[in-house]
Amino acid sequence: METNKQIALRALTGAFIDRDPNVVEHFTANYIQHNPTIPNGPAAIKDLIPRLPKDFSYQQGMVVAEGDLVMVHGRYVGWAPKPVIAVDIFRIEGGKVAEHWDVMQEEVHASDSANGNSMFSAPEEK
């Protein structure tokens, strides 16, 4: 049996790394989307995938899970004019992604940060 973490990561990997439109099989039929630029429903995810720019990339960072919620810290390049750091929050229901929220912010490099820290560290960078 897959964990909620594995389900959320499969959704992110399928959509943004593999660019597999069949990833929507892992979303509920009444999938709720809270990103204001993406409609509700798995069809919106399927439509989004082929529209990703050729130079688009996604890098997963920290993952935290509690109950039916999974939060993933990630770096999106090509989503916006500059790289974006995001926290994606997924609600899992019946082994599928049922709901999604995200908070996105343009990346500020450590050299430009008041504290000298980067906004993102991939697991392999720790």
Name each region found by the language model.
Residues 1-126:
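C-terminal and inter-domain tail/linker signature
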